[in-house]
Amino acid sequence: MDIAVDISNVYIVTQRLILRPWQKSDLNDFYAYASVPGVGEMAGWPHHKFKRTTKQVLQLFIEGKSVFAIEVQENNKVIGSIGFHSSWANDDPEYRHLKAKDIGYTISKDYWGQGLTPEAAKALIDWSFSHMDIDAITVAHFRDNYQSKRVIEKCGFTFVRESTYNARQLNRIIDDAKYIMLRSDISDK
């Protein structure tokens, strides 16, 4: 079952990052990574060809209050996003009784391979189970997105099944893999 999220006053600080609400002043940093071919496509959306597209998405992020900007502490640059979305578990007979949210993330190609996405994801998972009335967090990756698969494995999610995802913005059906982490998985450790 879906739950409401409001991150408008939430700041999560990790060793190298700050997860924080988006601001209009983030537009240039956002466009810098969202306009690079291959970045958005790994998450199901086409890279931004025009800054006005980024501006529209930025406004949706600000108004939606469910997606964080990922800011590097060292240089105060926004290099990605991570946030909550409606979970695939809401439509699954086995899991729909759970209060669940899906997490999704995107990071600048310039920062791939530095362990920043797992750092952000682990912090968001910890915050979620500490501050939200949530039973489960779900996540999925496109089958050929091995970087995302590694992030999911590093975070300790449990594989559920392979499936397909209708990436409407890309006008494609894509094979994906779905994972879940239950609150009980955390409390058992």
Model-derived segments and spans:
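Hydrophobic alpha-helical elements and their junctions with loops/disorder across both membrane
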Residues: 47-50, 61, 128, 135
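Conserved GNAT-fold acetyl-CoA-binding loop/helix
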Residues: 38-59
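Acyl-donor (CoA/ACP) binding surface of acyl/acetyltransferases
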Residues: 1-41, 71-189
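A short helix-loop-beta-strand connector motif used in the catalytic cores of GNAT acetyltransferases and
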Residues: 58-69
